């Protein structure tokens, strides 16, 4: 299902959940540092970059587009961590890992709304999301679980 909004077209799945995609942006394959961006609604809060899937767009393409727009980074898309539901907002977000290869000095959301980006240690990122965006905390916890599973193989 597709709904037109003044500033975007929103795509919904068969259950009425809005389809979204996001990336946990990491500096390298060790995945010890995570890039967060300031919220467009609350600039004092740090969140995971992501947004709505557009018509005829694959979630992986959405994830890459959204991190370029919101965080001003380009990178290598890695594994999908899964699809996470937010029942309060009726969203389903497909979350990927992105290894950042380039940080743009100037990007769309920094120009248009003063959005900032910042590297956090995994521990600091967990703390920020716990405080400001608990619904996204499961994204990082999933990354940690996958990383720990990989380390024990």
Language-model features, listed with the residues they occupy:
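A short gly/proline-enriched turn/hairpin at secondary-structure junctions
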Residues: 47-50
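Short connector loops/turns at beta-strand edges and beta->alpha or beta->beta junctions
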Residues: 40-43
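Unchanged
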Residues: 53-139
């Amino acid at each position: 299902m597709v709904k037109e909004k003044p500033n975007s077209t929103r795509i919904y799945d068969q259950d009425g959940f809005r389809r979204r995609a996001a990336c946990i942006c990491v500096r390298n394959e060790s995945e010890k540092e995570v890039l967060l961006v300031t919220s467009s609604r609350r600039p004092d809060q740090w969140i995971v970059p992501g947004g709505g899937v557009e018509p005829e767009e694959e979630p992986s393409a959405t994830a890459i587009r959204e991190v370029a727009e919101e965080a001003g980074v380009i990178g290598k898309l890695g594994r999908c961590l899964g699809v996470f539901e937010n029942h309060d907002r009726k969203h389903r977000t497909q979350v990927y890992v992105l290894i950042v290869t380039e940080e743009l000095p100037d990007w769309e959301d920094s120009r248009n709304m003063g959005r900032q980006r910042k590297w956090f240690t995994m521990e600091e990122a967990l703390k920020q999301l716990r405080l400001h965006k608990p619904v996204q905390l499961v994204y990082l916890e999933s990354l940690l679980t996958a990383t720990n599973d990989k380390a024990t193989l």
